[in-house]
C-alpha cells in the first residue's frame, strides 16, 4: 500500500486569531460580572466607551494606511485591549480618561509599531501607565465595595457619574466614595500601604472595614472570577501555564520570605495574590503573545520576574499596585530572555565554550 507523505505542518491548529481573542474575552466574563456586582455598573460603562473608541481608532488608522480594516477589526485584538484597559481603571473615572487611554493604546502603542504582532509593549498596560502618570487623581478614584457604601449607584447613576462626575441624584464622587462608616480608603493595597506608613502593623491594618479577614471585601471574589477564567484558558490551550505560574510563584515567594522575616511590616502571600490585579495580570495581561517571551523556559523567567517586580514596587515603590509597570519592564527584557533561552535546534549539538561561532 502506498502512503502519501503530507507536507508540514503536521500539527494543525484550527483556531485563528479572532477565535483565540474571543475565547480570551469569554474567559474575562466571570471576573467582569463579579467586578460589576461589587463595584458598580461603571465597569460596564467604561468597557462600552473603550470598545467604541478602540474600534473607531483602529478603523480610522487602518483606512489611512490603506489596509483592510474590516478583517483587522474581526481579529478582536483591539476589543480585547480595550476591555483589559477598561477593567483596570476606576469604574467611575471621567469618560475622557478611558477615551484618551484607549486611543493611546491602539494608535500609539499598537498601530504606530505596525499593528498586531509588531508592538513591543503591552498596549493596555502602556496606556494604563500613561494615564496614571498624566492623570493621577482620576486614576486613583476607586470606590469601596458597594456593600460598604452609603449610596449604591445603579446603571443610570453610573452613566451620569462617568460623564458628569455626579450621580442622577446629585451625589458627587467624593460622596459615593464615602463608606458607611466614613472610611474612604478604597483598595486593600492602598489601605495597608497607608497604614504601614503611619506606623500600624499589618494585623492592625487589616482591622479596616474594607477587609474580611486578610482579604479585601469584593476584591478576592473578583480575583477568583479571573482565576477561573485563566484556568479555562490553560485547559483550552489558549495560554500555557508558564507565565501565570511563574508570576504567581515569584510574587508569592517574595511575599512569603518577607512575611517570615517580619510579619508586622510585610503582608502575607495570600494578601498579595487575591488583593489587587495580580491574578488578572498573570492570566490575561502578561500572557500577551506578542510582547511576552516565546520559549517555555523564557516564559517562566518572564513571569517570575514580573512577580518579583510587582512585590518590590508594591512594598517599596510609590504605587500600591504595580502590574503595569512590572509588565512593561519585562517587555523590554524579552529579546534578551529569548536569546538566552532558545532551545537547541534539532540535529545540532550545543556549541562548546571557546568554539568559534
From Swiss-Prot:
A Pfam family this chain is assigned to: NQR2_RnfD_RnfE
Membrane topology: Multi-pass membrane protein
The keyword Transcription is annotated on this UniProt entry: no
Gene Ontology cellular component terms for the protein in this record: plasma membrane
Keyword Lipid biosynthesis appears in the UniProt entry: no
GO biological process terms on file: electron transport chain; transmembrane transport
E.C. number(s) listed in UniProt: 7.-.-.-
Keywords associated with the record: Cell inner membrane, Cell membrane, Electron transport, Flavoprotein, FMN, Membrane, Phosphoprotein, Translocase, Transmembrane, Transmembrane helix, Transport
Modified residues (FMN phosphoryl threonine): 187
Transmembrane segments: 20-39, 83-105, 115-135, 154-174, 214-234, 241-261, 266-286, 300-320, 321-341
Co-factor requirement: FMN
Function summary: Part of a membrane-bound complex that couples electron transfer with translocation of ions across the membrane.
Subunit-structure text: The complex is composed of six subunits: RnfA, RnfB, RnfC, RnfD, RnfE and RnfG.
Family statement: Belongs to the NqrB/RnfD family.
PANTHER family assigned to the protein according to its UniProt record, in alphabetical order: ELECTRON TRANSPORT COMPLEX PROTEIN RNFD, ION-TRANSLOCATING OXIDOREDUCTASE COMPLEX SUBUNIT D
Protein name: Ion-translocating oxidoreductase complex subunit D
Amino acid at each position: 500500500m502506498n502512503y502519501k507523505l503530507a507536507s508540514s505542518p503536521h500539527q494543525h491548529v484550527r483556531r485563528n486569531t479572532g477565535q483565540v481573542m474571543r475565547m480570551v474575552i469569554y474567559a474575562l466574563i466571570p471576573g467582569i460580572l463579579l467586578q460589576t456586582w461589587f463595584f458598580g455598573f461603571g465597569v460596564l460603562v467604561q468597557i462600552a466607551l473603550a470598545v467604541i473608541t478602540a474600534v473607531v481608532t483602529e478603523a480610522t488608522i487602518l483606512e489611512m494606511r490603506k489596509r483592510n480594516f474590516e478583517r483587522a477589526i474581526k481579529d478582536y485584538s483591539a476589543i480585547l485591549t480595550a476591555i483589559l484597559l477598561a477593567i483596570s481603571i476606576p469604574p467611575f473615572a471621567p469618560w475622557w480618561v478611558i477615551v484618551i487611554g484607549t486611543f493611546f493604546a491602539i494608535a500609539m502603542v499598537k498601530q504606530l509599531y505596525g499593528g498586531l504582532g509588531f508592538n513591543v509593549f503591552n498596549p493596555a498596560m502602556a496606556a494604563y501607565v500613561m494615564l496614571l502618570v498624566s492623570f493621577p487623581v482620576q486614576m486613583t478614584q476607586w470606590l469601596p465595595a458597594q456593600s460598604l457604601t452609603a449610596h449604591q449607584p445603579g446603571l443610570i447613576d453610573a452613566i451620569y457619574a462617568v460623564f458628569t462626575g455626579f450621580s442622577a441624584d446629585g451625589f458627587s464622587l467624593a460622596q459615593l466614595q464615602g463608606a458607611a462608616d466614613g472610611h474612604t480608603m478604597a483598595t486593600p493595597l492602598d489601605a495597608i500601604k497607608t497604614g504601614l506608613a503611619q506606623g500600624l502593623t499589618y494585623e492592625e491594618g487589616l482591622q479596616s472595614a474594607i477587609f474580611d479577614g486578610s482579604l479585601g471585601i469584593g476584591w478576592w471574589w473578583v480575583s477568583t472570577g479571573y482565576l477561573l477564567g485563566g484556568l479555562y484558558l490553560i485547559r483550552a490551550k489558549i495560554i500555557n501555564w508558564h507565565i501565570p505560574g511563574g508570576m504567581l510563584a515569584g510574587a508569592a515567594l517574595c511575599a512569603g520570605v518577607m512575611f517570615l522575616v517580619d510579619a508586622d511590616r510585610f503582608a502575607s502571600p495570600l494578601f498579595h495574590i487575591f488583593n489587587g490585579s495580580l491574578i488578572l495580570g498573570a492570566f490575561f495581561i502578561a500572557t500577551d503573545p506578542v510582547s511576552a517571551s516565546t520559549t517555555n523556559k523564557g516564559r517562566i523567567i518572564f513571569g517570575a520576574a514580573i512577580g518579583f517586580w510587582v512585590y518590590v514596587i508594591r512594598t517599596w515603590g510609590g504605587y500600591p499596585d504595580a502590574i503595569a509597570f512590572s509588565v512593561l519592564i519585562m517587555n523590554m527584557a524579552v529579546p534578551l530572555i529569548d536569546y538566552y533561552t532558545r532551545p537547541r535546534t534539532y540535529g545540532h549539538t550545543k556549541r562548546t565554550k571557546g568554539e568559534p561561532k
